[in-house]
């Protein structure tokens, strides 16, 4: 690449070509780094998210205008259902769900805690009275139960106080597998149920 004599050093033709090529590569690398920095500062593209119906209605959709104002180049495809999705098979980037992670090959991050409260419609309580203990629900009242869209398994009403734990599975007048329909059923006076505190605030 270099010609050396006792008095001077000159660049060979191959050396000059090597230098020119290296300068172009370094310039290209600088351009790539600049574009990546810009991409991080201004993310763009399509984002496929799947969330439960109540989460979509009460937590996600009300904040999408603010999200798009901050990230105008992101296109959101929002799937809304209470069923479990296959991230790979359904080509979904992100899922927001409550509960335990069933697939240990997935990466999960806790984004909050859900507080469930026991509720009933005023009309139901006027008709049936207000229970003073969870066992009264099983003995004297009707409950509205949520069941899994996948397995069909009923989720009990769960009561915890210290070391005491009571699960109520019935009797129920209605079992529902969609969260908005579940809340509507309770509001309609069909029985006692458990919903999140932010659902109750609505």
Q: What are the language-model segments listed below?
A:
Residues 1-11:
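A short LG(V/I)-centered, amphipathic sequence patch enriched
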Residues 5, 51, 81, 120-121, ...:
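A secondary-structure boundary/capping signal
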Residues 8, 46, 113-114:
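Short acidic-rich active-site patches of cyclic nucleotide enzymes
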Residues 10-38:
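Alpha-helical "hinge/linker" immediately C-terminal to small N-terminal DNA-binding modules
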Residues 44-107:
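Central regulatory/effector-binding core of bacterial HTH transcription factors
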Residues 85-91, 101-202:
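C-terminal regulatory
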């Amino acid at each position: 690449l270099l010609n050396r004599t006792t008095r001077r050093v000159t660049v060979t033709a191959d050396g000059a070509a090597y230098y020119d090529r290296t300068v172009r590569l370094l310039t290209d690398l600088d351009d790539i780094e600049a574009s990546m920095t810009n991409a991080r500062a201004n993310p763009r593209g399509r984002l496929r998210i799947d969330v439960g119906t109540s989460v979509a209605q009460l937590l996600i959709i009300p904040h999408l205008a603010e999200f798009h104002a901050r990230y105008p180049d992101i296109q959101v495809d929002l799937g809304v259902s209470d069923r479990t999705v296959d991230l790979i098979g359904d080509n979904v980037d992100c899922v927001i769900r409550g509960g335990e992670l069933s697939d240990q090959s997935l990466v999960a991050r806790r984004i909050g805690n859900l507080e469930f409260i026991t509720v009933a419609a005023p009309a139901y309580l006027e008709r049936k009275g207000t229970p003073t203990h969870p066992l009264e629900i099983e003995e004297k009242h009707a409950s509205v139960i949520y069941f899994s869209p996948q397995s069909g398994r009923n989720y009990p009403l769960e009561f915890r106080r210290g070391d005491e734990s009571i699960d109520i599975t019935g009797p129920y007048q209605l079992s529902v597998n969609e969260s908005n329909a579940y809340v509507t059923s309770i509001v309609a006076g069909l029985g006692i149920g458990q919903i999140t505190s932010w659902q109750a605030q609505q």
